[in-house]
């Protein structure tokens, strides 16, 4: 299994040193912040060349969600995502992770009444994805549509929700990203959800049930990795979560070493 990581607070700030550190820890790739990539693309290229550590994907680094309630923010976000995809193409990255929104609204907390109808939600997200479909086609990249749990987003919560957008809009350059943490909240059966969407699953985020490092909680990574292998999953699995330990760096190393046994 190819395992990557997002940035962590204890990683070096210098870009080359960051890449060296991630490579030395034993990771196979780096999921970079989109803004960091765009603003430092030559340094990133140099770091990739020196270390051999690929930038697999981007996550974050733009302002405005593809399902934003505010049209100006949505359009601004699309422009920024376009630039990130162009930058990813320059450095050999595969694509960008995008949710419909994050932290914008939830039916689970007051006021519990959305300022937009569900049909309006579907129209905005679909319109955005059709725009990004063209960008991804032009740049040879992929948009990884991410379902989030019900407390962080109200529009796309399950892999089946993401699948519906892709199928109904006939999108060829949009795939699903499955995040074990969010899936553990929303899916009836994580392994079954992965299997049912194996044809569109292009990327995976991992954290344990409590959002901390894999191996420190209750998720059955052995079973989930077995499912991915059985379905011939060829993408990366990327650490996205926090670390709970007195020595975060050592705990991260230990988690990765343990995950390699799954």
Curated annotation (Swiss-Prot):
Which Gene3D superfamilies does this UniProt record tie to the protein? Divalent-metal-dependent TIM barrel enzymes (3.20.20.150)
Principal EC category: isomerase
Check the record and name the InterPro entries matching this protein: Sugar_Epim/Isomerase (IPR050417), Xyl_isomerase-like_sf (IPR036237), Xyl_isomerase-like_TIM-brl (IPR013022)
Pfam families in the record, alphabetically? AP_endonuc_2
Entry annotation: catalytic residues: 146, 240
The UniProt family comment states:
Belongs to the hyi family.
Q: What is this protein called?
A: 3-dehydro-D-guloside 4-epimerase
Per the UniProt entry, what species is this protein from, by scientific name? Escherichia coli (strain K12)
What's the encoding gene here? ycjR
